[in-house]
């Protein structure tokens, strides 16, 4: 029986997080796997990400590998995926979310509140830039890119000596007071010790999908899936069954709401937009989905925030006695409610004039007219 081929980018972070997911998949399903490294344009370019012109720069090569049958599934950082999902592909599994917060990595243990006036802070994310300008307009923000080690090397005392993922040769060293990365990526790489502050989402709203991974496969036609159900040992049948075992429904529902917001605003993953949704207990034992979202002008001059929620109805009496039917009803209802919540919050932003803010929707103008993919770290 051939192993499942799992596609991944070649960076240390990508291979580490893909390995974690693939190992969990094997542990739960008993199916062997192999990692297939796919080089993406975002990995090999030496220029600014803006020069690549478009969102999804880290996903396109992986998606092509799935469609061409080079791999059975691809693992993405979900926040790097464009909000519009192609009809030829489906997100079949979203494992449990890691820490979704942004991480300040600063010299001398400094925090966002204790950084001195004029401190130089590096980030490649328009979302982080906009919120930092609103929170600390006295800071000097520096556009950066590169792998995690390259970014950390720009902060005195935080250079990581890793032969497998060294800092880029010739990149600046020690010229910044701090950088902002994602907690999830640092935790997955075992670099949590460089984090001087895990920034509260109420202070800095994370990117939609931050901390979550997506396992994407081909969206097969109904007749093909029907054959898979009839023959669970067929490759596609084994794949679907295995992915169901690593999918975390609450995380999948939450990111569905966050991505629905992006789609309704026609915004790319680079726009200065944040959103975080959670599934919790509501009334009468039924779930409740809550989402906090932020849309900002790129210069931080205006920041719009909204918190909204949707309460699900209890499971109907006609299915409550059938656990399988009740679970199917609940799952369908959760995803429909999540999609509606994301659209609702987006429409509230539009009513407040979010579509008039510079650099919020339909891509981000970085001065050369090219949209800028969000910070991959």
UniProtKB/Swiss-Prot annotation:
* Cofactor names: dipyrromethane
Keyword Protein biosynthesis on this protein? no
Give the species this sequence originates from: Micrococcus luteus (strain ATCC 4698 / DSM 20030 / JCM 1464 / CCM 169 / CCUG 5858 / IAM 1056 / NBRC 3333 / NCIMB 9278 / NCTC 2665 / VKM Ac-2230)
Q: Name one GO biological process term.
A: protoporphyrinogen IX biosynthetic process
What name appears for this protein in its UniProt entry? Porphobilinogen deaminase
Question: What does the miscellaneous comment read?
Answer: The porphobilinogen subunits are added to the dipyrromethane group.
The cross-references to Pfam families, in alphabetical order and at most eight, read:
Porphobil_deam, Porphobil_deamC
Recorded GO terms, molecular function?
A: hydroxymethylbilane synthase activity
**Might you give the EC number(s) for this enzyme?**
2.5.1.61
């Amino acid at each position: 029986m051939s192993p499942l081929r799992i596609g991944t980018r070649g960076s240390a972070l990508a291979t580490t997080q893909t390995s974690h997911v693939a190992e969990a998949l094997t542990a739960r399903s008993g199916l062997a796997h192999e990692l297939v490294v796919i080089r993406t344009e975002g990995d090999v370019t030496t220029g600014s990400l803006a020069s690549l012109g478009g969102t999804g720069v880290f996903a396109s090569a992986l998606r092509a590998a799935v469609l061409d049958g080079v791999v059975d599934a691809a693992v993405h950082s979900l926040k790097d995926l464009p909000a519009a999902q192609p009809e030829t592909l489906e997100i079949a599994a979203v494992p449990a979310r890691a820490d979704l917060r942004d991480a300040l990595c600063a010299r001398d243990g400094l925090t966002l509140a204790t950084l001195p006036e004029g401190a130089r802070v590096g980030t490649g994310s328009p979302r982080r830039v906009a919120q930092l300008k609103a929170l600390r307009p006295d800071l000097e923000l520096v556009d950066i890119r590169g792998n995690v080690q390259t970014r950390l090397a720009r902060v005195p005392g935080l250079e990581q000596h890793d032969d497998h993922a060294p800092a880029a040769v010739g990149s600046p060293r020690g010229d910044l007071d701090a950088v902002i990365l994602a907690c999830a990526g640092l935790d997955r790489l075992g670099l949590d010790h460089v984090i001087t502050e895990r920034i509260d989402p109420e202070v800095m709203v994370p990117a939609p999908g931050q901390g979550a991974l997506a396992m994407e496969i081909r969206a097969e036609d109904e007749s093909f899936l029907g054959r898979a159900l009839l023959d669970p040992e067929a490759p596609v049948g084994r794949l679907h069954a295995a992915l169901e075992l690593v999918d975390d429904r609450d995380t999948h529902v939450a990111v569905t709401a966050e991505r629905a917001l992006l789609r309704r605003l026609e915004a790319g993953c680079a726009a200065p937009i944040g959103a975080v949704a959670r599934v919790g207990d509501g009334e009468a034992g039924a779930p409740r989905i809550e989402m906090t979202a932020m849309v900002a002008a790129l210069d931080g001059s205006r920041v719009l925030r909204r918190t909204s929620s949707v309460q699900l109805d209890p499971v109907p009496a006609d299915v409550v006695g059938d656990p399988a039917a009740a679970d199917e009803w609940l799952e369908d209802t959760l995803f429909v409610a999540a999609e509606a919540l994301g659209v609702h919050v987006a429409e509230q932003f539009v009513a407040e004039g979010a579509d008039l803010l510079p650099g919020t929707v339909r891509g981000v103008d970085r001065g050369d007219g090219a949209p800028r993919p969000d910070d991959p770290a």
